[in-house]
Structure formats: structure tokens, C-alpha cells
Amino acid sequence: MKNKVVFIGMPGCGKSTIGRLVSEELKINFIDMDNYIENMTSKTIPELFEHGENYFRDFESLACRELAKEGKAIISSGGGVVKRKENIDILKEESFIIFIDRPLEELLGDVDISKRPLLKEGREKIIKLYEERYELYRLCADKIIRNDREIGNIVNEIKEVILDNLEMN
């Protein structure tokens, strides 16, 4: 049985916030993949992107391989982790993948583009990424959770899904 949960979804959909809350309630290790990559490389995500998106994606793939070896954990992935099939194949072996599906209108209203290299172009870029990735998120997910209500309700729903589907005790 799988012993990790990986949250996927658009930048700003709530992966890290929800992941932290779920991990605190279940007392399971939380790992933010972007922070993991920054610690691994001693560079920020924007600094890695200065060398090109593929340069960053190579480190993201390496992080997926390393995190697949972790014990019990809640992992918040980067928004583009689904762009490489190998990443999802690696993560699916030991992880239950949850797509945090947040309505586009809410993403457009909340996302801080200054800290997200791929979103520097603003609203149009968010819409384009959403259109490119939405179906990938749906196809990769073991479970889809809609983030369009009170966060406590979302956390409770995810806890139920985890306790029903994973070996986390």
C-alpha cells in the first residue's frame, strides 16, 4: 500500500497550504518540493529558471526520484511536475496523487506572480498554463479535490481520503 500523498495542481491552488494543514493534523512529515529543490541546489526557483525551464525541470525530476524514496510524507509538488511523464510515473509508484482543483477565476485573483517565474507575463500566462495543464492534472490524479470552499472542509475531506486509501499509521 502507498505511504505518501502528492498534491498536484496549478500555482496558487493551495497545494502547500492544504498540505501543511493535513500533515499537521495527521502528524505526517510535510515536504514542499520547490523548497526541497532550493535546498538541494542552493538556488532559488527563479535563479534556476534563469538557465531555462528544462534546467529547472531536470532538478525537479531528480527531486521526484529522491522523494519517492522517502518514508511517510505529504508532498506539495511544483505546478509543472506533470509536464514530464517520468515524474508522474516515479511518484505514482509509492504515492497517492491528489489534484487540488481550484477554479481559474480564484487563481487569477490570488496568485502572487512576482515569485513564480513562469507567470511573469500575468493573467494571460496563467490562463494559458491552466489550459495546457488541466487535463494532465486530471489524468494523473488518483483523486480530485475541488478547492472552492472553506479550507477546513477541504482538509477534512483529504484526511478521510488518506485514511481510507493509504498506509499512514
Curated annotation (Swiss-Prot):
Gene Ontology molecular function terms on file: ATP binding; magnesium ion binding; shikimate kinase activity
GO biological process terms on file: amino acid biosynthetic process; aromatic amino acid family biosynthetic process; chorismate biosynthetic process
Pathway of action: Metabolic intermediate biosynthesis; chorismate biosynthesis; chorismate from D-erythrose 4-phosphate and phosphoenolpyruvate: step 5/7
Catalyzed chemical reaction(s): shikimate + ATP = 3-phosphoshikimate + ADP + H(+)
Essential cofactor(s): Mg(2+)
EC number: 2.7.1.71
Residues at which substrate binds: D34, R57, G79, R133
Localization, UniProt: Cytoplasm
InterPro entries to which the protein is assigned, alphabetical: P-loop_NTPase, Shikimate/glucono_kinase, Shikimate_kinase/TSH1
Annotated ATP binding sites: G12, C13, G14, K15, S16, T17, R116
GO cellular component, one term: cytosol
Free-text remark on how the cofactor is bound: Binds 1 Mg(2+) ion per subunit.
Keyword Cytoplasm assigned: yes
Main subcellular localisation: cytoplasm
Keyword annotations: Amino-acid biosynthesis, Aromatic amino acid biosynthesis, ATP-binding, Cytoplasm, Kinase, Magnesium, Metal-binding, Nucleotide-binding, Transferase
Top-level taxon of the source organism: Bacteria
Sequence positions that bind Mg(2+): S16
Pfam families tied to this protein: SKI
Assembly notes: Monomer.
Protein family per UniProt: Belongs to the shikimate kinase family.
Function summary: Catalyzes the specific phosphorylation of the 3-hydroxyl group of shikimic acid using ATP as a cosubstrate.
PANTHER family: SHIKIMATE KINASE, SHIKIMATE KINASE 1, CHLOROPLASTIC
Protein name (database record): Shikimate kinase
Source organism per UniProt: Clostridium beijerinckii (strain ATCC 51743 / NCIMB 8052) (Clostridium acetobutylicum)
Record gene name: aroK
